[in-house]
Swiss-Prot record:
Highest taxon, organism lineage: Eukaryota
Native species: Homo sapiens (Human)
Name of the gene encoding the protein in the UniProt record: SPCS3
UniProt cross-references to InterPro entries, sorted A to Z: SPC3
TM regions (residue ranges): 12-32
Topological domain spans for side Cytoplasmic: 1-11
Subunit (UniProt): Component of the signal peptidase complex paralog A (SPC-A) composed of a catalytic subunit SEC11A and three accessory subunits SPCS1, SPCS2 and SPCS3. Component of the signal peptidase complex paralog C (SPC-C) composed of a catalytic subunit SEC11C and three accessory subunits SPCS1, SPCS2 and SPCS3. Within the complex, interacts with SEC11A or SEC11C and SPCS1. The complex induces a local thinning of the ER membrane which is used to measure the length of the signal peptide (SP) h-region of protein substrates.
Glycosylation, residue list: N141
Gene Ontology BP annotations: protein targeting to ER; proteolysis; signal peptide processing; viral protein processing
Role of this protein: Essential component of the signal peptidase complex (SPC) which catalyzes the cleavage of N-terminal signal sequences from nascent proteins as they are translocated into the lumen of the endoplasmic reticulum. Essential for the SPC catalytic activity, possibly by stabilizing and positioning the active center of the complex close to the lumenal surface. (Microbial infection) Plays an important role in virion production of flaviviruses such as West Nile virus, Japanese enchephalitis virus, Dengue virus type 2 and Yellow Fever virus.
Membrane-topology descriptor: Single-pass type II membrane protein
Record family assignment: Belongs to the SPCS3 family.
Pfam families per the UniProt record, alphabetical: SPC22
Localization terms from the record: Endoplasmic reticulum membrane
Protein name: Signal peptidase complex subunit 3
Length: 180
């Protein structure tokens, strides 16, 4: 005859198998959903300074400041399998020293139950926009893109890029002002 521990082990193993199958079923129902939505980005102000970079050699580096607006309706992304979204605004540009530079300028976490409609006006960069040299001065093609990671309850962590981006030129001169 089977002991109590043997029966408990069988019940636990069966329950674990059923839970794994249900979790996989939950994942597969939303795995192929398109999570891209239109995004409107508008840059209202760009300022460029040449400052000492205290993180590396004692050379002067470009420091950019951007004021921007974001408009997006993220409601269609949220379903029963989405726990939260990690949004981030990144700048992508090339210089003579580096073919590709990518810098995260701003981020935000949108939880399930929060307002999924973004109407952000006159936002400033959350993180410093340093270039490792003088590659921002006069750069005519700095592209800002809003992207997000979908954090699901079950399944993979997809990286999605919004269907709107904006390319902005940086000024040819440095600002002398003390504040932003």
């Amino acid at each position: 005859m089977n002991t109590v521990l043997s029966r408990a082990n069988s019940l636990f193993a069966f329950s674990l198998s059923v839970m794994a199958a249900l979790t996989f079923g939950c994942f597969i129902t939303t795995a192929f959903k398109d999570r891209s939505v239109p995004v409107r980005l508008h840059v209202s102000r760009i300022m460029l300074k040449n400052v000492e970079d205290f993180t590396g050699p004692r050379e002067r580096s470009d420091l950019g400041f951007i004021t921007f607006d974001i408009t997006a309706d993220l409601e269609n992304i949220f379903d029963w399998n989405v726990k939260q979204l990690f949004l981030y605004l990144s700048a992508e540009y090339s210089t003579k020293n580096n073919a590709l530079n990518q810098v995260v300028l701003w981020d935000k976490i949108v939880l399930r139950g929060d307002n999924p409609k973004l109407l952000l006006k006159d936002m400033k960069t959350k993180y410093f926009f340093f270039d490792d040299g003088n590659g921002l001065k006069g750069n005519r093609n700095v592209t800002l893109t809003l992207s997000w990671n979908v954090v699901p309850n079950a399944g993979i962590l997809p990286l999605v890029t919004g269907s709107g981006h904006v390319s902005v030129p940086f000024p040819d001169t440095y600002e002398i002002t003390k504040s932003y």
